[in-house]
Amino acid sequence: MKLPIGFETIHLKPYPYQIETINYGILHRNAGILLSMGLGKTMCAINIARYRIQNDNCKKVLVICPLTIMDKWKKEIQLISEYKATIIRGTPQQKKELIKQDTHFHIINYDALARLFVPLEDKKFDILIADESARFIQNPTPKRTEAALYLSKIAKHRMLLTGILISKRPLNLWSQFSFLDKGKTFGDNFYRFRNTYFYQISLGESKFKKYVVNKRRIADINKKIFSTCILFDRKEISDQLPEVLPTCKSVIVMDEDLQNTYDNIKQNILSEIATEGGEVKLGRIKILGRLIRLQQITSGFIKDSTGEYVRLSQTPKLDALVEEIESIYDDDESMVIWCCFLFSIDMIKKELAKREIAYISMTGADSAKEKNKKWMNYQKTNKIKVFIGQIVAGGIGIELFKLDATENEIQHMLFYDRTWVFDHTEQAAGRINRLGQKAKVRYNHFVVENSIDEKMYDTQTSDKDIADEIMSHGVKKFLT
C-alpha cells in the first residue's frame, strides 16, 4: 500500500500499518485512530492533517491533549511537518492572543477548553484532533466535555486518538463518538444510547448499581465502531516491535512482626467500615481510601499518630527492589520504576543516594515543562540509568526508552506500587515499548504475598475491576 500520489511524509518513513492508517484518515471525513501505545498515533494524525491542509482547503487545526504532552505535540509537528504550531498557555489574555496567531496548528489542553470557548469558537477550526480521548472525553456533563462536543460540531473534520477506546467505563463511548461524528454512530441522546446498549445490575448484595453492556448488542457496537475507526494492536505488528521478555512477578514475604502490623490495620479498617454503616453508606471512594493504608504498609511506611508518614523498621518490598536495582545497574542497563505514593519515591531516592546511583524523578508536583525536560534528559543521557516516576503523573505522553540502547540490551520497568486503575499500568508499560527502539523490554511487578498487593495484582491481571470486586463481594471477602 502507498500514500496518495504527490503526498509524502517528512523526516520519518512510515511502516505499512501507518500508511494504511493515514490513508484511512484521508478517506474518511472523521476517523478514530485506535493504535496501541507507542505505535505512532501522533505521526499518523499529523500527516492526515497535512494532507487536508494541502488538498482540502483546511488551514486551521486544533489539537486537544493532556497538559503534560502539549510540548511533545509541538515538537512532533515541527519535526515531521512543514508547518508551525502554537501552544495556547499563559494568562487568560495571553491565551486569547495566542489563539489569534496565524499558524496552521494550535495546541490546547482539555481543561482550558471551557474557559476559552468563545475565542476558540470564533477561530472556526477546520480540523479537531482529540488525543487520549478515552481518558478525557468521558461523562457528557463535565464542562470540558461539553466544550469539546460543541466545538466539534463546527469543525469540518475530527479525529479521535486513543490506544484504549473502551476502558472500564464503556458508557464513555457515547461522548467520544458524539465528538467524532456528531451522533451519527451512536445517536445524539446519551440516555437513549445507554438504554439501547446497556442494562443495570446490582453489585452483589450491596445497593450499588452499575450499567453493563448488553451482550446481544456487542456485535452491533463493534460494527458501528469500525465503521469510523481503524485499529492496530501490538499483536498484529509484533514483528516490528522490540522483543518483550516474559513478565516477572517478584513475590515478597512479610515476617511475623510486619504481618501482625498489617493484620491489625486490616482489622481496624474492617471495624471502621462496619461502624460507619458498611459498604452501602461509605461508597467505593471512601472504602478505597481506607484500603490505601494497607498498600502503604506493604510499600514500607505508615502514618503515625501526628499524621506524618514514617518508614517502617521492616521494608521487605523496598529491600527486594533495591536488590533488583543494584543487579540491573551492575549490568549497565537502564530501568524505569513506577510508584503510586510520593513517600515510596522518597524512600527509593534515599536508597539510591546511599549507593551513589544517579537518577531522575518525576511526580505530579512537576510542571509540564519540568516533566518534559526530565524525561527527555533521561532518554538522552547514558550516564543516568534510573528513572523514578509517579505513575499518574508520567504514565502518558512521554517516552522512556533509551535512544542509544542496542538490541543486545534490556530495558527494565519495575512496578513498586499499584494504582486502582489498570489502565494506568498499561499506559505506563508502553513508555518503554515503543516503535523503532532496539532493546528488549522486561517488566517486573513487586507483590507482597498474602496482602492487598496480591489481591490487586490478581484481580487486574484477570481483567477485573478492583472497585467492582470489592462492592460485589464486600471488603472482608476481597481481603481474605
Specify the residue positions occupied by each region the protein language model found.
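Walker B catalytic acidic pair
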Residues: 131-132
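Conserved helicase ATPase motor motifs in RecA-like P-loop NTPase domains
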Residues: 37-38, 155-170, 178
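Inter-lobe coupling linker of SF2 helicases/translocases
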Residues: 107-112, 118-122, 143-156, 160-161, ...
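Conserved pre-motif I regulatory segment
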Residues: 1-34
